[in-house]
């Protein structure tokens, strides 16, 4: 029987089982507590998370996976990579949060998606004039903190190549990888400090960048980087961790470098099986427990996979692992008391995945299986048999409808639709609008909570929602917005709201995961076939419409976003699930336009998230994702204007796909990126209309009228005003009313000033 290290967790959630970190951060930002309370709660969370893993028998437990905001931001702080505009902030806590969130006078650093997940990281801003230097306090302190509880952790670090590749240059023309000679000495110094901590220390370098299509030059830098780092100290055991796809090129590059191990994802990167003979005796951190989805592991399938791995890797060199950090899944099923018991039995959250690792280690490493161990396998397989036979999963009516789809696209070219829409809508040049949601006040959250818990009646709830809509419509009219929204007070989440009204979805009580900073989301769970039993948004939109003579947008979430922001069933192709959702959204659009709604927004905020990281897999995704969106809007008449919204995206590589989606208006997030994103549309000759977000809603900072006028003028240098809409860069639900009153008012004033100037020029 093998008795060595057998189990490994890439990283653990940090927001807290009851969102303790979120709550204390927001109290601190509201100046209702001191940093010492954050520090105390953070220490308690780290201790709890370490002990969970220790109790589950995990061999490799992490330190420095914890962060108060984001690990990429932590790494920038570690390297003293602080942009010049923050140089006057000397308090380290104030500096940290200013870089992430901005201040009244300073724009925050850019934020974007972490690969193809719904987690967002802060994008470091680098230049060759930066004085990089090491600040290792957090890393060293957390390692020592864990030792106080009897734990010798592996230390998690963002690897140099990933850090540089995901950073952006202050000078837009610079290649950030050219800065490797400047930051590598900081990493070397860090490793020397770590080597002094113990006679043997394990260090995990997260290098997910190598699962993308990287060029030969980057691979060479990757090789040189780890060749140098591996020679710092014989006390260190270096592990290069990859995840989200295969890393076959990197495995070959690392073949002759004396590192301890390589982490490979065998759930989303099965091609990794092809290069196991290149490990050369290194430990294989085998990612076999899905760190991105919430379904129970099929032990039989995983054991079969491990037997395949064992053909090329000695059993004693295999360590069973999660595919990636468990940051992407909720904490524990123990908090879920209202889930259907069958569906709950099919699930596994972070703490349950620890137990799955322990189970698989027993099944794989123990050669003479006892009755107890065999029972573990049998119980697991029984659950999968029951799921396969469950009537809760398949709806024959849905299957028949999908099989008989005849209409997949709407009528008319964009030019035909645009002409009809301009006549019907009669909007001014540079029309102003918002993305949809307005601030979710404590009062409105309490209203929803009380209704859900049967504390108030349906009439009381409806009255509260209508009062909010009344105020929201009145506010928008007062400041002069051109196209209004109802504010979405009835919606806790843009996906959950629709999931609650569609069949095939289930919801957790406490399934929160971190999206960015203190922002948490509670993804819906798709477990079965999807359909729409009845209209989902008609009543609230029609009520809002009755309160104004202006146009009110219908607000829907698109099928691809609903899919990508949900935990999707694992027994059906994602494309087939998306098609089912698209049919449900199509029915809703049809009902909305019949009710007189002239503009309908179908948000595809998460469209880019679903993109595979490897080019060879992209065409397949684009094909079914575009088809699903077009199927969803195929019921829209020519004169019905379809808007869509996309978040945090680099559009260079998907502009052709956006063209195929053919939305009449697309709103995008550009406020932290200047005109860089917009230029892509201009260069391409994009014909449809665009609403580039002109201010950053993720920061509490209120932009001035003059600043916004300048942004609009800059937009018009790239695209003609006839194609432009003026709007914030995202929904406003996370902001406070006091913030948005001024921001939106300034935005409208800026648009009106520019519009007036254009009209004067036109009549000269």
From Swiss-Prot:
InterPro entries, sorted: Cbl-indep_Met_Synth_N, Cobalamin-indep_Met_synthase, Met_Synth_C/arc, UROD/MetE-like_sf
Gene3D superfamilies from the xrefs?
3.20.20.210
Catalysed reactions, semicolon-separated: 5-methyltetrahydropteroyltri-L-glutamate + L-homocysteine = tetrahydropteroyltri-L-glutamate + L-methionine
Binding positions (Zn(2+)) = 645, 647, 669, 730
Q: Which pairs are disulfide-linked?
A: none
Broad class of enzyme this protein falls into:
transferase
EC identifiers of the protein = 2.1.1.14
Q: Which residues are catalytic?
A: 698
Role this protein plays: Catalyzes the transfer of a methyl group from 5-methyltetrahydrofolate to homocysteine resulting in methionine formation.
Instruction: Tell me what this protein is called.
Output: 5-methyltetrahydropteroyltriglutamate--homocysteine methyltransferase
Q: Which organism is it from?
A: Desulforamulus reducens (strain ATCC BAA-1160 / DSM 100696 / MI-1)
